[in-house]
Amino acid sequence: MKTLIRPLVVIFVVLTVVTGLAYPAVMTVFGQAVFPSQANGSLIEKDGRAVGSALIGQPFDAPKYFWGRLSATSPMPYNASGSGGSNLGPLNPSLAEQVKARIAALRDAGTDLSKPVPVDLVTASASGLDPEITPAAAAYQVERVAKARNLTADTVAQLVAANTAGRQFGVLGEPRVNVLKLNLALDAAQAAH
């Protein structure tokens, strides 16, 4: 029995050192050296101060800002500790009621409802933390944002186009607009205007 315990303890200690200390240390050094921005949370700074992350959505509800996907996290929106599959199923009657309420909120905010509403403006994301919307969802909001900021719709549309990221490597994913980056670009454009 003692002959079995010694190798087990040695293997346990070696694996603990390798997987608990060495591997995390090597990955941390590698991440900081090769991908420093991503390793530190992809933080977005304004005036030398972190204002958010490019990877986690934030609530914007003022008419002068583009609004992101809705967050279904609890107890508050965009709560990273509450992230996870929180959408209702497509056959759940509560989903239809929530979508109707969200469309009414868009109408109350002065959004033109004569055009079809992009689905990502009225449904929550699976994680509840999506930082991006589709170009269609951004284009849908251009008139409202331009009016609230006293800018031309063309100026705002150009900012949307400038902040639209294409597919990764030209084939992966869909074109998308990071809401935080777009709203910061809007603030900068208005300050320069």
Curated annotation (Swiss-Prot):
Subcellular location: Cell inner membrane
Molecular function GO terms recorded: ATP binding; P-type potassium transmembrane transporter activity
Topology of the protein relative to the lipid bilayer: Single-pass membrane protein
Superkingdom of origin organism: Bacteria
Transmembrane parts of this sequence: 7-27
Cross-referenced InterPro entries: KdpC
UniProtKB keywords: ATP-binding, Cell inner membrane, Cell membrane, Ion transport, Membrane, Nucleotide-binding, Potassium, Potassium transport, Transmembrane, Transmembrane helix, Transport
A Gene Ontology term for the protein's cellular component: plasma membrane
PANTHER family per the UniProt record, alphabetical: POTASSIUM-TRANSPORTING ATPASE C CHAIN, POTASSIUM-TRANSPORTING ATPASE KDPC SUBUNIT
Subunit structure: The system is composed of three essential subunits: KdpA, KdpB and KdpC.
Database matches in HAMAP family: KdpC
Function per UniProt: Part of the high-affinity ATP-driven potassium transport (or Kdp) system, which catalyzes the hydrolysis of ATP coupled with the electrogenic transport of potassium into the cytoplasm. This subunit acts as a catalytic chaperone that increases the ATP-binding affinity of the ATP-hydrolyzing subunit KdpB by the formation of a transient KdpB/KdpC/ATP ternary complex.
Similarity comment: family membership: Belongs to the KdpC family.
Name this protein carries in UniProt: Potassium-transporting ATPase KdpC subunit
Species whose genome carries this gene: Burkholderia ambifaria (strain MC40-6)
